[in-house]
């Protein structure tokens, strides 16, 4: 089993547990160049809020898009957008990535922004 399939297996297991709980989930995806965050409805059919470093308005204020500072900025923005839609409590879906570095920075910034995990 290679690294990617192991990560996807971990992600599927986590998503199944979150869907069983029936709460909104904050889904994070990272690439070497960008980081993405989405708040997804409990049934999985609707994206309630989204933010990423691909967005020109967010990326122009950042020094780089693939670093911890960018993840912190995305965490703050996703918390703000989710709260504007009436979502304050989410389950954190790290998509099989280690809870470390950029993923942890995004989660901490979202908590500081008012989201409860």
UniProtKB/Swiss-Prot annotation:
Biological process annotations from GO: translation
InterPro entries the record matches: Ribosomal_uL18_bac-type, Ribosomal_uL18_bac/euk
A GO CC term assigned to this protein in UniProt: cytosolic large ribosomal subunit
Keywords assigned by UniProt, alphabetized: Ribonucleoprotein, Ribosomal protein, RNA-binding, rRNA-binding
KW Glycoprotein (keyword) present: no
Transmembrane segments: none
Pfam families: Ribosomal_L18p
A GO MF term: structural constituent of ribosome
NCBIfam families assigned to the protein according to its UniProt record, in alphabetical order: L18_bact (TIGR00060)
Family: Belongs to the universal ribosomal protein uL18 family.
Function: This is one of the proteins that bind and probably mediate the attachment of the 5S RNA into the large ribosomal subunit, where it forms part of the central protuberance.
Subunit structure: Part of the 50S ribosomal subunit; part of the 5S rRNA/L5/L18/L25 subcomplex. Contacts the 5S and 23S rRNAs.
HAMAP family registered for this protein in UniProt: Ribosomal_uL18_B
Name used for this protein in its record: Large ribosomal subunit protein uL18
Organism of provenance: Thioalkalivibrio sulfidiphilus (strain HL-EbGR7)
């Amino acid at each position: 089993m290679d690294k990617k399939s192991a990560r996807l297996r971990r992600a599927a297991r986590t998503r199944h547990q979150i869907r069983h709980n029936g709460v909104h989930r904050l889904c994070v995806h990272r690439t070497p160049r960008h980081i993405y965050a989405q708040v997804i409805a409990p049934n999985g059919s609707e994206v309630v809020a989204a933010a990423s470093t691909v967005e020109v308005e967010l990326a122009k204020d950042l020094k780089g898009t693939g670093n911890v500072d960018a993840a912190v900025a995305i965490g703050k923005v996703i918390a703000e957008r989710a709260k504007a839609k009436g979502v304050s409590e989410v389950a954190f879906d790290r998509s099989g990535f280690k809870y470390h570095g950029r993923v942890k920075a995004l989660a901490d910034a979202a908590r500081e922004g008012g989201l409860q995990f």
